């Protein structure tokens, strides 16, 4: 009955928007989600374990030459009428001189049940059962020399109904689960594991925790050294390289380019000729979605071809403006109260041919993990942290008014780095950072054969989004210290 009520509410809202003369196009989503939040610390029982329900409706409205997004957790028809009125009014307030163009001929009718096998769907298990599995997984690390451990588990079983004024009607299901683990003592190590295969993600948890323990033991037993900031030949392990590449490809988002926050355009040199990057959808991956919030089927994008930018990340508006096609890159936020954003999905870096030992011999510093990136350009940092309407034309208008922010650089804290002496592991680096320019991959010296996948979450304009990147190790020159 609850799902039917959400579908009825979404249908009411799309019909209301179809009756608005000012509305050129609109997309409506009805959300029915059951969530679990579990935290396990040093106690042999969960610190917290709660189940949450979400029932709501959102709309993305094209009117008055602008685009606006609104969300409501009320399914009452009067409240939805007010939601529609406010969305149209906000579009009028944000109106631009350039009318928004959209694809009025695109129509989809489909259903997609996600990537969780029927027996692995998350709503088939209770919160207590999930909490017991979390406690069992960390029990061998509690009260040991491994240091303090914390495990965070988040999941949601979500059904979404997507409707638009073209007549599209799509139903999707997603069973998404993620673990975040921290082990702290003489050193602190972190990891994240996420997927959309439902309860099957639990099968990968022991391996993640075992790897976390190995990194912790390796770090605390190593001699420690400090480094003065200097340009060095650096070996980035696959997950460190993935973190770097994921941060750099955000400069290829069409709204970032429109705002003047990117030094790149399509056709520019992004990296060395060794570098090829695709943006993909991997079935069961943490960022896997069958459709984006514009009801576009998610399809692969050739992002960087032998070092040259082959495409940008687009929504339907920016794609039509540039006479190209959108590929389903408008991702919903983890919290639907915040607008969807143009964003990378699964960033896939093609492997190289260099064996691990040769990579190590080429570098003087090796880095296993990088922390969250920080943009040193104050203008870029402030704009990406602020709320911005999900409208590329509004972004372009912001770019015209924004002062020149100066040089773009990104800084990453090192979470697991050490010196290399003739390819062998030396002292551990503590308290150091890596700082790079957006063009750092032009100096890419070597790519490894073996790839690994990093998952996590990132914020863009206050919207929290999942990320996923698969990369080989790489050697490049950058500032470390």
Question: Where are the regions a protein language model picked out?
Answer:
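N-terminal small-residue-enriched
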Residues: 1-481
């Amino acid at each position: 009955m609850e799902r039917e009520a959400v579908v009825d509410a979404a249908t009411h809202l799309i019909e209301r928007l179809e009756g608005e003369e000012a509305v050129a196009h609109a997309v409506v989503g009805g959300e029915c989600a059951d969530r679990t939040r579990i935290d396990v610390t040093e106690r042999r029982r969960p610190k917290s374990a709660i189940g949450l329900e979400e029932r709501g409706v959102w709309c993305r409205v094209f009117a008055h030459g602008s685009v606006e997004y609104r969300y409501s957790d009320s399914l009452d028809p009067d409240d939805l009428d007010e939601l529609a009125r406010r969305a149209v009014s906000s579009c009028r307030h944000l109106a631009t001189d350039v009318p928004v163009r959209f694809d009025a001929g695109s129509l989809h009718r489909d259903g997609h049940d996600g990537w969780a096998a029927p027996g692995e769907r998350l709503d088939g298990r209770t919160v207590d059962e999930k909490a017991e599995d979390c406690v069992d997984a960390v029990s061998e690390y509690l009260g040991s020399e491994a240091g303090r451990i914390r495990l965070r588990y988040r999941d949601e079983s979500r059904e979404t109904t997507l409707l638009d004024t073209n007549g599209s009607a799509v139903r999707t299901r997603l069973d998404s689960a993620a673990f975040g683990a921290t082990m702290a003592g003489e050193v602190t190590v972190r990891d994240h594991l996420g997927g959309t295969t439902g309860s099957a993600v639990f099968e990968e948890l022991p391996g993640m925790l075992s790897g976390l323990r190995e990194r912790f033991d390796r770090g605390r037993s190593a001699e420690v050294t400090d480094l003065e900031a200097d340009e060095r030949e650096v070996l980035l392990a696959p997950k460190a390289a993935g973190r770097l590449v994921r941060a750099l490809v955000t400069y290829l988002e069409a709204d970032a380019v429109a705002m003047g926050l990117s030094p790149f355009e399509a056709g520019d040199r992004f990296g060395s000729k060794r570098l090829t990057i695709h943006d993909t959808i991997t079935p069961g991956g943490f960022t896997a979605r069958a459709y984006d919030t514009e009801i576009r089927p998610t399809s692969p994008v050739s992002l960087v071809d032998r070092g040259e930018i082959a495409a940008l990340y687009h929504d339907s508006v920016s794609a039509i403006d540039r006479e190209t096609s959108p590929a389903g890159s408008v991702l919903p936020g983890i919290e639907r109260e915040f607008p969807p954003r143009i964003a990378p999905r699964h960033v896939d870096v093609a492997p190289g041919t260099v064996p691990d030992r040769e990579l190590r011999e080429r570098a003087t510093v090796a880095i296993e993990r990088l922390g969250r990136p920080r943009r040193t350009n104050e203008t870029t940092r402030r704009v990406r942290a602020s709320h911005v309407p999900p409208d590329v034309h509004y972004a372009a208008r912001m770019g015209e008014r924004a002062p020149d922010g100066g040089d773009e650089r990104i800084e990453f804290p090192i979470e697991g780095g050490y010196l290399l002496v003739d390819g062998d592991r030396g002292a551990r680096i503590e308290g150091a950072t890596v700082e790079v320019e957006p063009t750092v991959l032009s100096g890419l010296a070597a790519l490894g054969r073996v790839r690994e996948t990093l998952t996590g979450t990132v914020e863009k304009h206050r919207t929290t989004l999942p990320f996923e990147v698969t990369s080989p190790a790489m050697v490049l020159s950058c500032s470390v210290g």
